[in-house]
Amino acid sequence: MARRRKGRAIDGILLLDKPLEISSNQALQKVKRAFLAAKAGHTGALDPLATGMLPVCLGEATKFSQFLLDADKTYIVTAKLGVRTTTSDADGEVVDTRQVNVTEQQLIDACETFKGPIKQVPSMFSALKHQGKPLYHYARQGIVIEREARDITIFSLKITRFEGDEVDMEVHCSKGTYIRSLVDDLGQLLGCCAYVSKLHRTAVADYPSDKMVTFEMLESLLEKAQAEQIPLTDILDPLLIPMDSAVKALPSVELTPASRDSFLHGQPVPYVSEATIDQGTLVRTYCTEGNVFLGVSELDSDNKAAPKRVVVFTEQG
C-alpha cells in the first residue's frame, strides 16, 4: 500500500522572490512548510548567489512544472570586468586578472554577437549530469569533463549601466541558458575577463515580477494567522496563482461533463474548440461545466483529446 503524504492537498503556484545565500531546494522546503503542503516542486534552480523569481508548484501543479522549466527567462545581471573565476561568479576562486580597456561601443558590439540562436558550452559548475553525477561534483575535484555546446537563444541583451569595471545587463533568453557562461564568454571576447557579481531573475514565461512573494511577507502572514486564528486557506492560499497558468501558452479545448471522468481516467475523448488546431498539438483541457482545468492533452488522429497530464481531484466538484 502506498504511504499517504502528510500535509494539505493544496494546488497552485507561488512566485517566490528567492533571497541571497539560500539554495533553491532550501527555499522550496520553506515554502512547503509554510503552506503545510503535501507536495511541492520548483521550476528551475537559481544559484545561491542569485535572487528573484522562483515559481514553486504545490500539489497537482507539480505535474505542469516542466512547462515552466522550458519557458523563457529574463535576468538582470551585474558583470565585473577584469577578473575571471573558477565558477564564473563571485563564489569562485580568481584564476585570471586583466586590465580593463573597454569602450562602451566595444561592449555594445560584443553583446550584439550573442543575440539570436547561439551555441553555449555549459559551465563545469552546473547541475548538468555526467554519468549520473552533476558536473560541479567533478569540478570540485579538479576534474574537467568535455561538454558539448548546446543550442540556446538570446532574445535580447540590453546594457543598462556601464561604469568603470561594472556592467549591468538585462537578458531575455531561452531555457538552458547559463548566465554565468554568457558573462564569461563575453569577458573572453572583450579580452578582459568577466564574472557575475549579481544575478536577479525578473521573469519566468510572462509571470509579472510584481506578483512575487518574499519570505518576509510569508512570515508576517503566518504570524497574523496565528495571532488572529485565521485559517491558512484564507491568508496564504490567495497568494497562489492557478496551476493552468503554467500552460497558458498552449491552445485550449473543452470537454463536456459526460466526457470528464473518462478523460481523468486516461481515455481519449471528443473535444470542442472554436479554433482549428493541428493533430499532435498539446492543449490545455477544460470542462465546459465551470471551466474547470482538467490537465494537458494531445489531439490525436481520431479528433480526440488524449490525456498527457491530468489533475487528480481530492474532492469531486
Curated annotation (Swiss-Prot):
One GO term (biological process): mRNA pseudouridine synthesis
UniProt key word DNA repair:
no
Q: Which InterPro entries match?
A: PsdUridine_synth_cat_dom_sf (IPR020103), PsdUridine_synth_N (IPR002501), PUA-like_sf (IPR015947), PUA_sf (IPR036974), tRNA_psdUridine_synth_TruB (IPR014780), tRNA_sdUridine_synth_fam1_C (IPR015240), TruB_C (IPR032819)
Catalysed reaction(s)? uridine(55) in tRNA = pseudouridine(55) in tRNA
Superkingdom is: Bacteria
Q: Which family does it belong to?
A: Belongs to the pseudouridine synthase TruB family. Type 1 subfamily.
The family database entries (HAMAP family) matched by this protein are listed as: TruB_bact
State what protein this is by name.
tRNA pseudouridine synthase B
Q: Name the lineage.
A: Bacteria, Pseudomonadati, Pseudomonadota, Gammaproteobacteria, Alteromonadales
